[in-house]
Amino acid sequence: MSLETLARRYGTPLYIYSADHIAHRLELFQKAFSTVPHLICYAVKANSSLAILKMLAARGAGFDIVSGGELERVLAVDRGAAERVVFSGIGKTAPEMDLALRAGILLFNVESEGELELLSERAAKLRRRARVALRVNPDVFAETHPYISTGMREHKFGIEIARARALYRRAGKYLEPAGVSVHIGSQIRAAEPFGAAAERVARLVAELRRDGHAIRYMDLGGGLGIEYHAERPFDPEAKVREYAEALIASAAAVKDVKLLLEPGRFLVAQAGALLSRVLYVKKNGQKTFVITDAAMNDLIRPALYQAYHEIVPVAARRGSRKMVADVVGPVCETGDFFARDRELAAVRPGDLVAILDTGAYGMSQASNYNTRLRPAEVLVEGRRARLIRERENIGDVLAAERRALKL
């Protein structure tokens, strides 16, 4: 089924994903870590579509969550997958802890002294034993956008390694110190920072074991990046192999430990595209603007992170000329753009364009800004395409307010 057919059937803006691509990327991870005990815990925040979670759960993947809502999504597709869930995040609430305790998740990644105390209280109240890993801050610099760098001491995440041993000693009766966790950021393309962080975690695991703690998990987080520029070489198999070799070598000094990995973007980003229809092409002085029916509420990465995405016409015209333009949406902000001063194949109103590599942090960050309706989503499996999320309608958007106001 062609992209134009999908766009006509389901409308635009429209997210489309390749199930085969996601499955292949998961296989690359499994193969790269096949020499050591491991569990791939997909980072739900990257793309929380129920259909994608279901296909990953069916392939034995675990899940990295950062909210009770994300846990509810995992439980909705496979309640048995709770035993493969790690719960990260710096602001877990008591109700979220209770939900996770009752579900029987694999591991709580604890990020502060206060969180450890609250989790101990909730576990005692429910009489549920909780396996915990302290997320330590390794003070490792990762070359990435500052908003998604998380492993330096000035960041809000984790606990100083120097304080970790003392906090483990304070684990209450219903808490089982079972692991150590680290996560240094997202969209990191070099292997060295991951290896440096893993080395520091491995040393801490050895110290904790000498203290008498039966540490059996090293959660080394996620963050492996992709290449968004089409002209730059990117070999995903070589990249994940290099990443795995760095982590395995750094953790080699620690025996009888299971590695937990939390890939998100690497699995799903390049599986997705956002289809959008060109509404207008206009000029302001020397500037050309391509106005699409997609906007920053559908894909905020360019506005938020100055992120680059390739934008291509779905049906290029023979001998079509090039144009230099800003590709923008209808939202009432100058920051509503997908590309600035971009050379692309000339387009005109009615043309369908694809914004590439939007399978991660696209729909999961979409909003209703300007009371715009969030897009539909389609999953392509082989030659079959199926709707996995209906396009929002105005009734969906207004429902909570109408109930509150009895309108």
Residue ranges and their predicted role:
Residues 1-130, 169-176, 210-213, 383-407:
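A charged N-terminal "starter" segment
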Residues 256-407:
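Charged (often Lys/Glu-rich) extended helix/loop segments that serve as interaction or gating elements
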